[in-house]
């Protein structure tokens, strides 16, 4: 299994705090950055290969990745990061995504028990949602039906909708099917949307 971390965005909603570094290089309590924490937890969970998409500040991400010699880290640059969303970065990374996939957004901070639990679950395809939290205004929500994920968007409401956290465990076949749909969006020039639009 490989991990894919999306870190090609500008982080514009964070204003001046991301002027000199990407969101994933934001320091948490104790001084550890989000990216460092994610890589540390991935390594601890037994992941050996990580693909990271990059936009601005590639060098900062590379320097952090170099601190983990047990991880084979591949950086995939998105030269169009200013004009595209991470659906395009996902597409650019396709050649490296030839395995089961653990996919997460680069600004997520999660408990140390999460990844081992997700990886140990016998289900091949897993996504994370929280039925106890109120729906966020601007962040991801999901719609479920019959226990299966039907839709992920920032613009959902109503019955069957829940707060969603973009962490996915995907079988190789499921990841490939999603990437096929992503390729259709890219071919149509529809690169300003979320990768979840192509689910």
Give each language-model segment a name.
Residues 1-61:
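N-terminal glycine-rich phosphate-binding loop and ensuing alpha1 helix
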Residues 187-199:
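Catalytic core and acceptor-binding pocket of nucleotide-sugar-dependent glycosyltransferases
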Residues 20-23, 29, 33, 84, ...:
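Residues at secondary-structure transition points
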Residues 34-37, 89-92, 198:
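Well-ordered alpha-helical segments embedded in enzymatic catalytic cores
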Residues 61-140:
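Conserved beta-loop-beta/alpha segment of the NTase-like Rossmann-fold superfamily
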Residues 13, 60-63, 113, 177, ...:
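Phosphate- and divalent-cation-binding pockets in alpha/beta enzyme and binding domains
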Residues 111-189:
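Conserved core of the sugar-phosphate nucleotidyltransferase
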Residues 46-47, 72, 97, 148:
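Short loop/turn motifs at secondary-structure junctions
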């Amino acid at each position: 299994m490989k991990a894919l971390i999306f870190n090609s965005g500008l982080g514009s909603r964070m204003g001046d705090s991301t002027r000199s570094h990407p969101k994933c290089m934001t320091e948490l309590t104790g001084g550890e950055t989000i990216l460092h924490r994610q890589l540390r937890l991935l390594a601890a969970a037994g992941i050996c290969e990580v693909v990271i998409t990059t936009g601005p500040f590639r060098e900062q991400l590379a320097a952090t990745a170099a601190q983990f010699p047990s991880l084979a880290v591949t950086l995939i640059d998105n030269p169009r990061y200013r004009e595209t969303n991470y659906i395009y970065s996902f597409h650019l990374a396709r050649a490296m995504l030839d395995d089961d996939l653990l996919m997460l957004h680069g600004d997520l901070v999660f408990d140390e028990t999460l990844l081992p639990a997700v990886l140990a679950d016998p289900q091949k395809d897993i996504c994370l949602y929280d039925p106890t939290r109120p729906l966020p205004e601007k962040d991801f929500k999901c719609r479920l039906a019959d226990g299966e994920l039907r839709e992920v968007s920032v613009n959902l409401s109503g019955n069957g909708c829940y707060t969603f956290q973009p962490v996915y465990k995907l079988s190789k076949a499921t990841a490939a099917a999603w990437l096929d749909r992503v390729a259709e969006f890219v071919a149509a020039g529809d690169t300003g949307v979320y990768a979840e639009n192509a689910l």
